[in-house]
């Protein structure tokens, strides 16, 4: 996926009210960006970081600029727009860049399923194969080269794991897919130190037949693509 038009660069002043961030451009202008990330954004929003943002041509938007990427002061590139996790995963599936998810003839998005009436991110189908249910999570929390999810307690994420276990019990294929959107991450684990219940459920889900995949994106201000499978340790 290529950014078109190209992203613009600025320096982060502060993120606040969860959805807003003030930046200063190279020519000295101060702008307020929309921040499309409701998480803690630990390590992704330090004042002084380089920010890459897009600009919408929708004149009705109060904040036409959207924060897309951070380049930390240590040099790591991080995609902070959580919407890209699903977009990049869909692109990779359609391009058959994810070997574990190749060979299907149909891809559907936002399909209702399960006893808790969730919506699965993607459902893959093919003749003579079980349906494949895929839940996507964006990974941006890093400690050294270790990636973690979640970055805050997530009851919604816990619900998704319960739903996937039910799918696997019914004989369908269930996959939790971690889209790693941080250039410094080389391996993935659940964030037991943040959400112990989620980590416990993820281990239980694997034991009950839910597949766990983690793929890392190549990230730049020019574009992004999921490319590399990462090791997962529970």
Swiss-Prot record:
Transmembrane segments: none annotated. The keyword Cytoplasm does not apply. This is Sugar fermentation stimulation protein A. CDD domains: SfsA-like_bacterial. Keywords: DNA-binding. The keyword Nucleotidyltransferase does not apply. Binds to DNA non-specifically. Could be a regulatory factor involved in maltose metabolism. Belongs to the SfsA family. Residues 201-220 bind DNA. GO terms for molecular function: DNA binding. Gene3D superfamilies: 2.40.50.580, 3.40.1350.60. It comes from the Bacteria.
